[in-house]
Amino acid sequence: MNLIAAAIAIGLGALGAGIGNGLIVSKTVEGIARQPEAGRELRTLMFIGVALVEALPIIAVVIAFLAFFG
């Protein structure tokens, strides 16, 4: 049962991060296409957003370790 819980935690964490990163990057590209002069600011905000979204799989791995070994 712990193995299933760990797999679900990692899988859903990766799924959420993948969808979130895709949305962030697509909206950034759309914004740069509309306003090329704002590209530098949008790119900076994109990297901050991607970093925040990537925290989710890291937290999911920690929860999976706790479920598996705890």
Swiss-Prot record:
Q: How does it sit in the membrane?
A: Multi-pass membrane protein
* Localization annotation: Cell membrane
Specify the superkingdom.
Bacteria
Q: Which SUPFAM superfamilies match?
A: F1F0 ATP synthase subunit C (SSF81333)
Query: Which GO cellular component terms, listed alphabetically, does the Swiss-Prot or TrEMBL entry include?
Result: plasma membrane; proton-transporting ATP synthase complex; proton-transporting two-sector ATPase complex, proton-transporting domain
Q: Which PROSITE patterns match?
A: ATPASE_C
Give the residue spans that cross the bilayer: 4-24, 45-65
Q: Which UniProt keywords apply?
A: ATP synthesis, Cell membrane, CF(0), Hydrogen ion transport, Ion transport, Lipid-binding, Membrane, Transmembrane, Transmembrane helix, Transport
> Hey, where's the site called Reversibly protonated during proton transport on this chain?
E54
- Molecular function via GO: lipid binding; proton-transporting ATP synthase activity, rotational mechanism
Functionally, this protein is described as follows: F(1)F(0) ATP synthase produces ATP from ADP in the presence of a proton or sodium gradient. F-type ATPases consist of two structural domains, F(1) containing the extramembraneous catalytic core and F(0) containing the membrane proton channel, linked together by a central stalk and a peripheral stalk. During catalysis, ATP synthesis in the catalytic domain of F(1) is coupled via a rotary mechanism of the central stalk subunits to proton translocation.
The family this protein is said to belong to = Belongs to the ATPase C chain family.
Q: Assembly state and interactors?
A: F-type ATPases have 2 components, F(1) - the catalytic core - and F(0) - the membrane proton channel. F(1) has five subunits: alpha(3), beta(3), gamma(1), delta(1), epsilon(1). F(0) has three main subunits: a(1), b(2) and c(10-14). The alpha and beta chains form an alternating ring which encloses part of the gamma chain. F(1) is attached to F(0) by a central stalk formed by the gamma and epsilon chains, while a peripheral stalk is formed by the delta and b chains.
Please report the name of this protein according to its UniProt entry: ATP synthase subunit c
Gene assigned in the entry: atpE
